[in-house]
């Protein structure tokens, strides 16, 4: 069983992979130029890695929770993923990811986003 976790943002999408509920690792983030380009890149990952479970972070709390949840669910619908999708609370994952010692948080390369996705998948499977 393979799972993919997504930390969907407006500029970047953090991505992490879990294999057989034992091994989890962050992948390169997808830099969003537009929705369709980003959706196509994620679709490709879903296919290449033969994903059977998609874990998607939803921000809980905060003033923009409702709007971000709507945007994230719309993006997920563009993936046309016909297997299991699980939405999880991503609150605090970025802060926790900083504890992993990302070398340069000013550099917007998506490493922090993919570490957030890694934390979501790690928590989901209690790794």
Swiss-Prot record:
Molecular function per GO: nuclease activity
Source species taxonomy: Bacteria, Pseudomonadati, Campylobacterota, Epsilonproteobacteria, Campylobacterales
Places the protein is found: Cytoplasm
The name this protein goes by in its record: Putative pre-16S rRNA nuclease
Function description: Could be a nuclease involved in processing of the 5'-end of pre-16S rRNA.
InterPro entries: RNaseH-like_sf, YqgF, YqgF/RNaseH-like_dom, YqgF/RNaseH-like_dom_sf
Superkingdom of origin: Bacteria
Enzyme Commission number(s): 3.1.-.-
Protein's organism: Campylobacter jejuni subsp. jejuni serotype O:2 (strain ATCC 700819 / NCTC 11168)
């Amino acid at each position: 069983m393979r799972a993919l976790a997504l930390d969907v943002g407006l500029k970047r999408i953090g991505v992490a992979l879990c294999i057989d509920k034992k091994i989890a690792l962050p992948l390169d983030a997808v830099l969003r130029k537009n929705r369709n380009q980003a959706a196509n890149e994620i679709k490709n990952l879903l296919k290449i890695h033969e994903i059977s479970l998609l874990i998607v972070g939803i921000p809980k709390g905060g003033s923009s929770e409702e709007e971000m949840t709507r945007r994230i669910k719309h993006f997920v619908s563009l993936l046309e993923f016909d297997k299991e999708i699980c939405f999880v609370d991503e609150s605090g994952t970025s802060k926790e990811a900083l504890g992993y010692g990302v070398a340069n948080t000013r550099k917007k390369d998506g490493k922090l986003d993919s570490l957030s996705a890694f934390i979501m998948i790690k928590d989901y499977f209690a790794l």
